[in-house]
Amino acid sequence: MPQLNPAPWFAILVFSWLVFLTVIPPKVLGHTFTNEPTSQSTEKTKPEPWNWPWH
């Protein structure tokens, strides 16, 4: 039963993962994101009071 011999299957598994790990990450990391994070001010803004006409 050749299916039980792990030597060729293990080599194919390791080689395929090696190819995936060398080809896919540069393609994924090469994308640019449209929404770049911006630094926000740490100062808290004072809320403006609402001028409601109370009748």
From Swiss-Prot:
**Region (Disordered) location:** 34-55
Q: Does the keyword Glycosyltransferase apply?
A: no
Looking at the UniProt entry, the stretches that span the membrane are 4-24
Q: Where in the cell is it found?
A: Mitochondrion membrane
* UniProt keyword annotations, A-Z: ATP synthesis, CF(0), Hydrogen ion transport, Ion transport, Membrane, Mitochondrion, Transmembrane, Transmembrane helix, Transport
Q: How does it sit in the membrane?
A: Single-pass membrane protein
Q: Which cellular component appears as one GO term in the record?
A: mitochondrial membrane
Briefly state the protein's biological role: Subunit 8, of the mitochondrial membrane ATP synthase complex (F(1)F(0) ATP synthase or Complex V) that produces ATP from ADP in the presence of a proton gradient across the membrane which is generated by electron transport complexes of the respiratory chain. ATP synthase complex consist of a soluble F(1) head domain - the catalytic core - and a membrane F(1) domain - the membrane proton channel. These two domains are linked by a central stalk rotating inside the F(1) region and a stationary peripheral stalk.
Quaternary context: Component of the ATP synthase complex composed at least of ATP5F1A/subunit alpha, ATP5F1B/subunit beta, ATP5MC1/subunit c (homooctomer), MT-ATP6/subunit a, MT-ATP8/subunit 8, ATP5ME/subunit e, ATP5MF/subunit f, ATP5MG/subunit g, ATP5MK/subunit k, ATP5MJ/subunit j, ATP5F1C/subunit gamma, ATP5F1D/subunit delta, ATP5F1E/subunit epsilon, ATP5PF/subunit F6, ATP5PB/subunit b, ATP5PD/subunit d, ATP5PO/subunit OSCP.
Listed name of the protein: ATP synthase F(0) complex subunit 8
